């Protein structure tokens, strides 16, 4: 229901691409739950006994057409779905026990390798493998999580960036949004923000205050 309410493609390049975004995005979620890590892998939810678990799924090519319609604004729409879903889940299940005490907000950037010369947004960034610094082509998502003394971390925000992006780019805004998400999820205690030295700048400190 959140997807149906939040996600809108008002000016599609391909009209069929914007049709029924909610069940198409649910197909992506179902595929990820089943182990898919690419668009082609989403076909696994249409085979074997999967149809007894997932109803009304779409072909990978159809999903790809929808995703190519997405812009940064649509990514923000999905972020709002994530925030409201977490808040709604916490109303029904004790996902964050101990949220009335101290909670921990962690932020970090990752480098996820991608392949192919035409991969949108991919660029070379530094990563460490077996203790050695190397350049690797990929995307650098910025991730925030919230946890407590009694609860494992849950994701409060994720944003894809080019592989060469500085770790601290956009961190202040991500932290502010993560704090708002944590409060909406029922965190009433003190929130301690944790990150490495890449986030030790005045804008991040201002967001934490």
Predicted regions and their residues:
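Dynamic "connector" segments at or just before major functional cores
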Residues: 1-166, 170-185
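Short, active-site-adjacent cap segments at secondary-structure transitions
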Residues: 112, 200-201
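Residues that form or flank phosphate/diphosphate-binding pockets in enzymes
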Residues: 169, 202-203
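Short, hydrophobic/aromatic alpha-helical segments in well-folded domains
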Residues: 174-178, 194, 204
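Acidic/histidine-rich, metal-coordinating catalytic segments
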Residues: 189-200
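Short, surface-exposed basic-aromatic patches at helix termini and helix-loop junctions that form
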Residues: 205-209
